[in-house]
Amino acid sequence: MKNIKSQILLASLLVASLSCIAAPRLVYFGDTLQWNTDWVKKQCGTLDIKANIIEVSGIACSRVTPGYIWMQSDETAKYIIATDEKGEKRACKVNMSKTIRWDWEDMSGGVYEGKNYLFIGAFGDNDETDGEYSVVWFEEPAIDPENAPEITVTPNRIKYVYPDGKKHNNEALMYDNRDQVIYIITKVYYNVCQVFSLPFRTDYGDEEQTLTYVCDLGVKSDLGEGTKPYKGFHLVTAADISPDGKYILIKNHNNIVATYCWVLLFTREEGESVAETLIRQTHPEPIKAYNTYEWQGEAICWLDSATFYTTSDADDGNPPIYKYTKKVNAAVETVQTKKADDKTLVMIDNVMYIRSKQGLFTLDGRKVQ
């Protein structure tokens, strides 16, 4: 009994010590980036993998049925599921009428010609030997847990190749609502990851498309010359663009310990393409997105431009679901649009809030200040 208690104590001390370790600094284009401290992280739920899905590698907030999060696994290309942010119960299972490649690695949602679509990156290729890459897409279905807990859709796909003619491993995909462009990011160990783009259309058919090279995420010298720890940004596992197109998140996991995750936040200027933002902003703001229990963090998505979620690729434990909320600074309130019943609608950083005597709330009633 003493031995068991000693082991438990040792494990607890180890966890505590890991959680107290300062995150290593991130070097990007030769400079050490400064942490962005404008985001508050909290665990909003725990994903019950037996009731939902294992090894989540991509998530996307539902736009058709707000309040739910779509999730897909890199273990199956047969279905996706939807759950709420608590992750306790599956609200919907969407089966694919046909299987399109097995290694799904990321997903995103977006609007095209007035319709909401879901995009899935069927492009994982760890050994860079496959060479068959595609983006799976279909119109986002409504979520109705009571009347339609399980439905079937017919997926489409866009087959593509890289402009260099080589094979690449990928784990990150994002869709830009402003310009209707899909962005794909390679996952590279101990080297610089690359960004590619493809305009979305629904009429590509079966013809292979060639991606356009956009940029590198950093330079090789950021990583050091064969030394550990590697301080540069590599091993990209997820990405997403806010619905209004203003913010870009790119997530990785570090090689020091897989629990360390960096999230780069890029801010897009008006009239700028995503490609122009990534090329211009060589000093993005890294958000502290590491946690002792966020093992293999491979999924990220925006709810709105002030809130995003992350979760992890786990098959032997229920991973936490984290919610990041941007801190609100009353000094940046720019518009007061309506006042009724002692409540005022205010616009802060392009996001609408309700201010009352009790504090500041999101439109769905969540208190943020």
Language-model features and meaning:
Residues 6-8, 255, 335, 357:
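Intrinsically disordered, low-complexity regions enriched in polar/acidic and amide residues
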